[in-house]
């Protein structure tokens, strides 16, 4: 007589495992701006390369309806060797305008190779943000967007110590999205308080000295036609 076989199905929920559900809320204004890009008569055919910060840009772009008609590829060459492989050389310093422009150029070439044609757009973003232990130098990012028209660049210096790492990353993602939008002829809306689209407040109530540092933040933007 064959032995009887039994099976038990165990279903574990996140709550049973003690795992807290992460918030999936995405900034509505960022999604609206991404949607504006996708609704263009000729939406950009985007390849993006991001390292060091600004990775929150990926879910903002990909969670917006219409992404499949515009986003070709989004990559994060985070390791030094990975970035060197993308650029074709190992830069002595990875967070500067030249690296951002090289990343944008490689991304643009990739978009062309994937069939983007005249709508090909390449975005490069490199950043140095809050870390543990605290970083010695400035918290900053460099963003470049390459299109058939030319190269749009943004250099942004953040107020050191005013934000969490997550908030700094969101600022960089916003700056990248705003630069991309302007390169495509879409003006990003200002924040409700009248500040630039990329700017975010500190996680905690702002002390006067923190507010002053945030007010002192600056961004330098340039465009060079091809």
Show which residues each predicted segment covers.
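Glycine-centered flexibility motif
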Residues: 4, 54, 216-217
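Terminal signal-anchor or tail-anchor transmembrane helices
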Residues: 4-21
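Short alpha-helical segments enriched in small residues
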Residues: 24-198
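Non-catalytic propeptide/linker segments at domain boundaries
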Residues: 188-226
């Amino acid at each position: 007589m064959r032995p009887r076989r039994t099976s038990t199905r165990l279903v574990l929920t996140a709550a049973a495992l003690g795992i807290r559900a992460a918030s999936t809320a995405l900034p509505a204004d960022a999604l609206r701006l991404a949607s504006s890009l996708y609704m263009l008569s000729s939406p950009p055919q985007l390849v993006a390369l991001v390292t060091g910060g600004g990775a929150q840009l990926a879910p903002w772009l990909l969670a917006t309806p219409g992404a499949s008609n515009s986003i070709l590829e989004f990559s994060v060459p985070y390791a030094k060797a990975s970035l060197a492989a993308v650029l074709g050389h190992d830069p002595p310093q990875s967070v500067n305008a030249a690296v951002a422009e090289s990343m944008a150029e490689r991304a643009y070439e990739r978009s062309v190779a994937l069939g983007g044609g005249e709508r090909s757009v390449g975005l490069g973003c490199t950043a140095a943000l809050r870390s543990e232990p605290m970083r010695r130098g400035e918290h900053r990012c460099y963003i470049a967007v390459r299109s058939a028209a030319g190269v749009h660049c943004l250099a942004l210096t953040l107020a050191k110590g005013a934000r969490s790492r997550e908030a700094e990353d969101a600022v960089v993602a916003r700056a990248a999205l705003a630069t991309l939008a302007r390169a495509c002829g879409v003006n990003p809306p200002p924040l409700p308080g009248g500040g630039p689209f990329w700017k975010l407040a500190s996680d905690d109530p702002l002390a006067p000295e923190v507010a002053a540092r945030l007010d002192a933040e600056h961004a330098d933007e340039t465009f060079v036609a091809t």
